[in-house]
A protein has these predicted regions:
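Active-site histidine-anchored catalytic micro-motif
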Residues: 105-174, 184, 276
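Alpha-helix-centered segments that form part of catalytic cores
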Residues: 178-188
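Catalytic cores of soluble, metal-dependent hydrolases
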Residues: 2-17, 23-111, 123, 129, ...
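A general structural motif
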Residues: 168-169, 186-194, 220-222, 262-267
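Short, glycine/polar-rich helix-capping loops at beta-to-alpha or helix-loop-helix junctions
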Residues: 193-203
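Active-site flanking residues adjacent to catalytic metal/cofactor-binding acidic residues
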Residues: 115, 139-141, 188, 238-242, ...
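Solvent-exposed alpha-helices and their adjacent loops that cap or buttress functional pockets
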Residues: 3-6, 128-131, 153-154, 176-180, ...
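Short, glycine/acidic-enriched loop or turn micro-motifs at the edges of active sites
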Residues: 119, 141-145, 192, 242-244, ...
Length: 314
């Protein structure tokens, strides 16, 4: 075991939420990742670990309201299915933001376990509340940069990066919006992007590296570029959607897309982040144990987290 002296504490918080997509089961992701030995693995590589448990995620049937607007008000703002379950998602993200802010203010590393990717709004808002404006490396098959106006589905897990970049307005509250800058943002591993997202990527000035770019450049040069861009922020935040990997590597995700990162490519990306010394926070999204095979995807998530954090902030 490596020495723990001088290393920050890693504080884990789970977000058992599947309200942002249209397939159930992602809410069990935090349990699946923990079951795969996350705390033991991080302890073995020399970190002190504190697990804060899970935040509460309300069921839509509870009829809760947030930020002085009721569900009916949000539904009246737009015609059609523009932001499903937004009230409960916002409430969960606000609670997550409060926890992440406490962790970051203490100088520790937030490690957020999902849960669907809409939770990223809360993670980045929490960092902002703590005075942190990190660059973001968003590794994902999808852009997650739709707004309520551009979304074809109304699924909020396709909107969190747009909200964090300030591209989305109502029904998302102001304190979740504009928490990071497109100049320091990178999308890596893209292979399924909606038409409206293409425009939003350009509008925000985000650096986008598709799987075609990775095939052409190689993962190493692509990741070097990502770190160079995101590293200009206040450290780097890693937002890793497990569907960035090829379904042969990570079958337990809700929106699999063929042609993703290989195991070795994903490991190299994490190793390069560790070597950069700039990683300050991590979230793992979209692990779905119901769709997994013998918890393979959750176990892989543990490996990748360990690789990303192994040599960070010595």
């Amino acid at each position: 075991m490596r020495r723990m002296e001088g290393r920050p504490v890693i504080e884990i918080v789970g977000v058992p939420m599947d309200l942002g997509g249209n397939r159930r089961g992602v809410d069990m992701g935090p349990s699946g990742i923990r079951y795969s030995g996350l705390v033991t693995k991080l302890s073995e590589i020399g970190f002190r670990v504190r697990d804060r448990g899970n935040i509460h995620v309300a069921d839509p049937d509870e009829g809760l309201a947030t930020h002085a607007y009721k569900r009916v008000d949000a539904e009246r703002m737009f015609k059609g299915p523009r932001a499903h379950n937004v009230t409960e998602i916002v409430r969960a993200c606000e609670e997550l933001a409060s926890v992440v802010a406490d962790i970051a203010r203490a100088g520790n590393i937030p490690l957020v376990l999902g849960g669907d990717h809409s939770m990223a709004m809360g993670t980045l808002a929490g960092l902002a509340r703590a005075g942190k404006r990190p660059g973001v490396i968003w590794i994902d098959a999808h852009g997650d940069i739709n707004t309520p106006e551009t979304t074809p589905s109304g699924n909020v897990h396709g909107m969190p990066f747009a909200v964090a970049l300030g591209l989305a307005g109502d029904p998302f509250p102001a304190d979740l919006r504009g928490t990071t800058s497109g100049q320091h943002g990178v999308l890596l591993g893209l292979r399924d992007v909606d038409p409206g997202e293409r425009d939003n990527i350009k509008k925000a000035g985000v650096t986008a590296l598709t799987m075609a770019d990775i095939d052409r450049l190689g993962l190493g040069p692509a990741m070097e570029r990502a770190i160079a861009v995101a590293g200009k922020g206040d450290g780097i935040h890693l937002s890793l959607d497990m569907d960035a990997l090829d379904p042969d590597e990570a079958p337990g995700v809700g929106t699999p897309v063929r042609g993703g990162l290989t195991y070795r490519e994903a490991q190299l990306a994490m190793e390069m982040l560790a070597a950069s010394g700039k990683l300050r926070s991590v979230e793992i999204a979209e692990v779905n144990p119901i769709l997994d095979e013998s918890n393979r995807t959750a176990a892989l998530a543990v490996e990748l987290v360990a690789s990303a954090l192994d040599e960070t902030i010595l």
